[in-house]
UniProtKB/Swiss-Prot annotation:
Residues 31-52, 103-107 are cytoplasmic. GO terms for molecular function: arachidonate binding; enzyme activator activity; glutathione peroxidase activity; glutathione transferase activity; leukotriene-C4 synthase activity. This is Arachidonate 5-lipoxygenase-activating protein. Changing residue 66 to A: Strongly decreased affinity for the inhibitor MK-591. Disulfide bonds: none annotated. Required for leukotriene biosynthesis by ALOX5 (5-lipoxygenase). Anchors ALOX5 to the membrane. Binds arachidonic acid, and could play an essential role in the transfer of arachidonic acid to ALOX5. Binds to MK-886, a compound that blocks the biosynthesis of leukotrienes. Changing residue 113 to A: Increased affinity for the inhibitor MK-591. It is found in: Nucleus membrane; Endoplasmic reticulum membrane. InterPro entries: 5_LipOase_AP (IPR001446), FLAP/GST2/LTC4S_CS (IPR018295), MAPEG (IPR050997), MAPEG-like_dom_sf (IPR023352), Membr-assoc_MAPEG (IPR001129). Homotrimer. Interacts with LTC4S and ALOX5.
Length: 161
């Protein structure tokens, strides 16, 4: 693979690998809580603390394929840097959601809502990239620079709660 190709996906790969480490952390928390309750064997039922850890992990796992799909689509079809930034923000929010879910369930709500907004942003970046492709294909008009400028400008607004 040549350097230019790697340069176009390296940030997305870094965010993906960080998300894998985060998934490992969540799985470790579930395993630790399970062993605390049941000794050596893994059980899907247990105390309230285990149920919360297990449910928080399961909710994060359920949203993970969607996150990866829109992260890579937005990064490849639109712009890598804002997509990677949004991906890092999503991982931070997912951590906040996970930790918040272990406490009071109302503490997880801000992370959940913020995560939905980031997924929507990545989805819209992907749609803009696809739309630009078809504009080039059918009309010969390339709006890639405008789309990259807009997405780069809007991505810091994801920090606003």
């Amino acid at each position: 693979m040549d350097q230019e190709t790697v340069g176009n996906v390296v940030l997305l790969a870094i965010v993906t690998l960080i998300s894998v480490v985060q998934n490992g952390f969540f799985a470790h928390k579930v395993e630790h809580e399970s062993r605390t309750q049941n000794g050596r064997s893994f059980q899907r039922t247990g105390t309230l603390a285990f149920e919360r850890v297990y449910t928080a992990n399961q909710n994060c796992v359920d949203a993970y394929p969607t996150f990866l799909a829109v992260l890579w689509s937005a990064g490849l079809l639109c712009s890598q840097v804002p997509a990677a930034f949004a991906g890092l923000m999503y991982l931070f929010v997912r951590q906040k959601y996970f930790v918040g879910y272990l406490g009071e369930r109302t503490q997880s709500t801000p992370g959940y809502i913020f995560g939905k907004r980031i997924i929507l942003f990545l989805f819209l970046m992907s749609v803009a990239g696809i739309f630009n492709y078809y504009l080039i294909f059918f009309f010969g008009s390339d709006f890639e620079n405008y789309i990259k400028t807009i997405s780069t400008t809007i991505s810091p607004l994801l920090l606003i709660p």
